[in-house]
Amino acid sequence: MRKMFIFEFILAAHVVFCILIEMQSIIFPIQQKLVDLDNVGPVKKNTHANHNSYFDLFGFFGLCIWLLLKYFFEGFRFNSILIMAAYTFFFFDRALQFADKILCQVAAVLTILYIWTLISYPVYEFPKSTGKYRTCYKSIKLNDSYQTDTSVYYPCQDNKQEDIKYKWLPNNKFSKLIYELSILSTKWAPSEWIFDIGLSFLNFINFTASIEQPLINKELDVIIFSHGFSQHRNAYTTLCQQLASEGYVVFSLQHYELVYPWDIKGTKIYNTGNYPEIIEKYQKIRSSHLEWRIEQIQQLIDNLKSNKIKDVFYDFKPLSINLIGHSFGGASVLRVAQEINVNSVIAYDPWLFPFNQEQMHKQVKCRTLILSKDKNRIKQEWFDPKLLKEFLDFNTQIEHYKIKGLDHAYPVDLTYLIAAEMVLIGELRTDENLFKINNLISSLTIKFMQQKLFSIEENKQFS
């Protein structure tokens, strides 16, 4: 279901009205004016200066009011820059008074583009969980050496309680993380304020879960989820809630590595053609970050096994411990699986760049599934498919499937929130199969943990 932003359409209607009034002498050269502002209220005919003042006052204050309302109640998307530019051209046209209204025509084109993006580039509501259990959510801080912030999604008792809304973003730093990632990964990145504006609507994104209730059982299977690079602990809420609705207790950890790790502002780490010494330095930095992640996961496993989370769930006993991770998180859970034995490990398109040579050749100790994309977006040293092939050559027991149409961004919730923008920058090939691919990932994940066979239809999705 599409998420509606009312103030987007109000802004569009406001600027369309202003442009029509301003250009009515061109659009309707013979017919009577749509609105004769020369005779409105106290403004008298032939008082052109007063006419301009009245109209500019109306347009300017209308713009300010609607922009402020949108900012404080909905936030801006990247396409909001189009409507801001349309207003700018419109008021420049008013100030300069070009006879052919050329700037006003530019404003009209920008407004049409803006309306087109509202229709063509939707933001989707997070899909509802389809499992048989109600799901609850709580945010906790683990008593480990990192004081790790953790989101817990769990199946709870159904006492006909209400669902409540929770903020999707755990803090206000996400746009900065995405900006820093863009600096690293692209040849050119816009200014940070562009990201602050274009992603501010994420501050108003919520997900729903039941008000806090007891667990359905004191003995349940546990999943520890490790998020991808530059993401956060709530970034996979749709998947985590689906897993919780199937009867799993999901602990989604917050990792704290830096996105841009040093102060060489001109360094483009991810681009092809970097000097080997820079790539080597970057690999060592990310390798140290990988060790931080491993410590967080291992400490949570130890706490679960020794029942040291009584403040979260009293007298809870995990029936099994399973690890799931995406991208950097995928590498994290694979690395843990090389050191300790858990019930199962699932890695979504793991980013193996931080692995050293010894780790690339070390075997995992448990049942492991890797789901990866069928096609690389661009050639990048940091995501060379040869790394995964080399890892699998030394781990032949791992089940590995390439999924048709899968891009690296799946299964992040951003695929529902900024799918069109991700297509534009090449993170997604298309935004047409979002729900299908995310549902497939969820289904394969659950069946693997339950040791069930994939269906014939699911096997057809493997390349």
Regions flagged by a language model, labelled:
Residues 1-84:
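Extended, compositionally biased non-globular segments that define protein topology
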Residues 113-222, 431, 454:
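Domain-level recognition of soluble alpha/beta enzyme cores
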Residues 168, 173-183, 187, 234-277, ...:
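Active-site machinery of serine-nucleophile hydrolases
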Residues 205-220, 225, 229-262, 377-380:
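Short substrate-entry loop that stabilizes the transition state in hydrolases
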Residues 216-217, 344-410:
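The feature captures the conserved acid-bearing segment of alpha/beta-hydrolase catalytic domains
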Residues 265-315:
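Alpha/beta-hydrolase active-site loop
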Residues 324-329, 333:
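Gly/Ala-rich beta-loop-alpha elbow adjacent to hydrolase catalytic centers
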Residues 389-463:
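C-terminal catalytic-base region of ester-bond hydrolases, centering on the histidine
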